[in-house]
Curated annotation (Swiss-Prot):
EC number: 2.7.2.11
Source organism (scientific name): Burkholderia thailandensis (strain ATCC 700388 / DSM 13276 / CCUG 48851 / CIP 106301 / E264)
Function: Catalyzes the transfer of a phosphate group to glutamate to form L-glutamate 5-phosphate.
Family statement: Belongs to the glutamate 5-kinase family.
GO CC term, one of those recorded: cytosol
Reactions that this protein is recorded to catalyse: L-glutamate + ATP = L-glutamyl 5-phosphate + ADP
Main localization, broad class: cytoplasm
Annotated binding of ATP, by residue: 14, 173-174
NCBIfam families: proB
Keywords: Amino-acid biosynthesis, ATP-binding, Cytoplasm, Kinase, Nucleotide-binding, Proline biosynthesis, Transferase
Domain called PUA: residue spans: 280-358
Protein name: Glutamate 5-kinase
């Protein structure tokens, strides 16, 4: 089996905390130097690389003399602010050894949820790549809150792959890849060499939290691959402990788990809706509505809604889930949660009689709805 990275030109490489730190005790300068050397070699082969790197909080903890990751958000943000300085400095100096300039970009979910800011971020990244600069991206932990955070850099890496229409996302971790079961508990567990990104059985195989240093477990990586597939990007999950792993992947060697994007690439606007707008609520829909959305490409009408969950306003994104709780679609709602509760299970012709007005006959128009 040949690595999908060999034929990929534009890469997003995500490096986890454990691969750039000394077991959480500050940055590992030598390790960062090796990543810089490999990326420089990829550049010489004509590949474009965007690096998503963890490590700011771990470096901040070291500089502040903290041995344990704090739980308070203000202390985490303080550590990120202190550590981001060191992270940027080390990357800049290590890449400079190869004659490569770097750029620091800090993002939050809010940056990508706003369409204008999303397009500005995309334009900046593409310009940096055109100029031969290696963008180094991290979540802006200093200002992030629960409502605007990505939660982990695996997710951020996938969204960046969507943003720049990358060919592949490489998630480097301290694990060999995805196994059929937890190899620490099941001696019969085997490595999944290749699968389709978004295959339901993958989520059942993955699970467990990340290390105390970082935040991402294997499940977040599987979900990241599913997101990356929305823009046609394939994903490789591999061990960053493997010698010259990036160079070997680029040469065609199959390492780790390859998750192939086999679904059709989403239109740009729907991809943005699916991946960058935060879900504010849920509606449970009946089997008939599920069929109309998934097979018929229809709009969601109020009559197909069984229940409304959460509080949301007109124009916000809501998820459509089946009776088992599985999300099948999401989209921009024409009605608030209060209005939706009043018109659920009602034919569209009765909306005006119930509310006193009718904004739209659909709860979500098909042009504002995307399957997930």
């Amino acid at each position: 089996m040949r690595s999908i990275i060999a034929d990929s030109k534009r890469l997003v490489v995500k490096v986890g905390s454990s691969l750039v730190t000394n077991d959480g005790r500050g940055l590992d300068h030598d390790a960062i130097g090796r990543w810089a050397a490999q990326i420089a070699a990829l550049r010489n082969e004509g590949k474009e690389v965007v690096l998503v790197s963890s490590g700011a909080i771990a470096e901040g903890m070291q500089r502040l003399g903290w041995s344990r990751r704090p739980r308070e958000i203000d202390e985490l943000q303080a550590a990120a602010a202190v550590g981001q300085m060191g992270l940027a400095q080390v990357y800049e100096s290590r890449f400079a050894e190869h004659g490569i300039r770097t750029a620091q970009i800090l993002l939050t979910h809010a940056d990508l949820a706003d369409r204008e800011r999303y397009l500005n971020a995309r334009s900046t990244l593409l310009t940096l790549l055109r100029l031969g600069v290696v963008p180094i991206i991290n979540e802006n932990d200093t200002v992030v809150t629960d409502e605007i955070k990505f939660g982990d850099n695996d997710t951020l890496g996938a969204l960046v792959a969507n943003l720049i229409e990358g060919d592949a996302l490489i998630i480097l971790t301290d694990q060999q890849g995805l196994f059929t079961a937890d190899p620490r508990k099941d001696p019969g567990a085997t490595l999944v060499a290749e699968a389709s990104a978004g295959a339901p059985e993958l989520e059942a195989m993955a699970g467990g939290a990340g290390s105390s240093i970082g935040r991402g477990g294997m499940l977040t990586k599987i979900l990241a691959a599913k997101r990356a597939a929305h823009s046609g990007a394939n994903t490789v999950i591999a061990s960053g402990r493997e010698r010259d792993v990036l160079l070997r992947l680029a040469s065609g060697e199959a390492i780790g788990t390859q998750l192939i994007a086999r679904t059709a690439r989403m239109a740009a606007r729907k991809q943005w809706m699916a991946d960058h707008l935060q879900v504010r609520g849920h509606v449970v829909i009946d089997a008939g509505a599920v069929d109309k959305l998934t097979a018929g490409g229809k709009s969601l009408l109020p009559i197909g809604v069984v229940a409304v969950q959460g509080v949301f306003a007109r124009g916000e994104v809501i998820a459509c889930v089946n009776d088992a709780g599985r999300e099948v679609a999401r989209g921009i709602t024409n009605y608030s949660s209060a209005e939706a509760k009043l018109i659920q299970r009602k034919p569209s012709g009765e909306i005006e009689a119930v509310l006193g007005y009718m904004l739209e006959p659909e709860l979500i128009h098909r042009d504002n709805l995307v399957l997930v």
